Amino acid sequence: MASGDGGDDAGVKRVADRYLKREVLGEGTYGVVFKADDTKTGNTVAIKKIRLGKYKEGVNFTALREIKLLKELKDSNIIELIDAFPYKGNLHLVFEFMETDLEAVIRDRNIVLSPADTKSYIQMMLKGLAFCHKKWVLHRDMKPNNLLIGADGQLKLADFGLARIFGSPERNFTHQVFARWYRAPELLFGTKQYGSAVDIWAAGCIFAELLLRRPFLQGSSDIDQLGKIFAAFGTPKSSQWPDMVYLPDYVEYQFVSAPPLRSLFPMASDDALDLLSRMFTYDPKARITAQQALEHRYFLSVPAPTKPSQLPRPPPKGDSGNNKIPDLNLQDGPVVLSPPRKLRRVTAHEGMEVHMHRADRTEEHPSGARHMDDMSSQSSRIPMSVDVGAIFGTRPAPRPTLNSADKSRLKRKLDMDPEFGYTE
């Protein structure tokens, strides 16, 4: 990889000139992603241009972490980092170009996913996770738009900016990772000591999202997110999760019994439901691992996973079609009944009881910070594999990301490697 060491500006410029930038693919807090042509190989690549900013902001450390980890993570289900070089005050990361992502597949109403298609996507996701965990790497930002899909249909884990080496039981990490809808309950309860089980919970949420064609648990706050989880799987008992009551931000919730998993995913196979239940196990110590999940009978039973090259994919960008997805989740969260800084007992809001959506008003699938638009008529609904109105209500919430407050906290508290000059 190009480094520009020794003040070799001409050498760095030659590396930069190798790539001919085309259109912008996306823009984030720290930089821009371009589509580009590699004049040396003739391949199309994606270049992430990162604004390095001031040293104290820590942006460059996040990029260095991603570079370091991706140099070690060479696998067919993990995005390939081709090159990295500084140029004109920015750090450029060159990745293999991927046509789309799993979120686009989920949102595209013109795509019909068969059970074999879903199985294929989940298998590739778990293969990537299993490789990361084998190398003692936590991803910590699993969500559909970080699962990229290439022209050959291959799914690959991407965006390792929050990834972390794990393994030491005494090592503390920040719990402000993952977008909220994909956070495991132990993270929502404030644990700072965790392992690969947090990635598995998020993978379970993605599995559920593929089955439902919409985000599964859409909390508007951490407490509300826990309420959504407990409404779906029941309030955990100490016998299920002995360490729960010792977590830093533990909140006692009113007991709610778990509805049958079949009622949430009526179209899923028995094997799929069994795997989901193991991925959504409350106690992280008992939660299934990625390798164990790959060996689960779900992947051995018929139908066999679809070959990646035969998977349906969304149309090119700009030809979005009708990709609006109904969303039946309730934004209101459970109510905290007792004062702060004491053991808080939380009960489910009465709005989490039966509260069905009007037939002529469905909401657009949330993405980023966009507001939701009403769909035109009942005929524009897509078939849902679960009637969740009785559990989750009706009002949509915007898809969460790591917001500015989260990022500010991460800048102060990210547990960086000592070699990057950043310690906690």
From Swiss-Prot:
Pfam families: Pkinase. Residues 303-337, 359-424 are annotated as: Disordered. GO terms for biological process: positive regulation of transcription by RNA polymerase II. ATP binds at residues 25-33, 48. Induction: By gibberellic acid (GA3) and submergence. Residues 19-299 form the Protein kinase domain. This is Cyclin-dependent kinase D-1. It comes from Oryza sativa subsp. indica. The gene is CDKD-1.
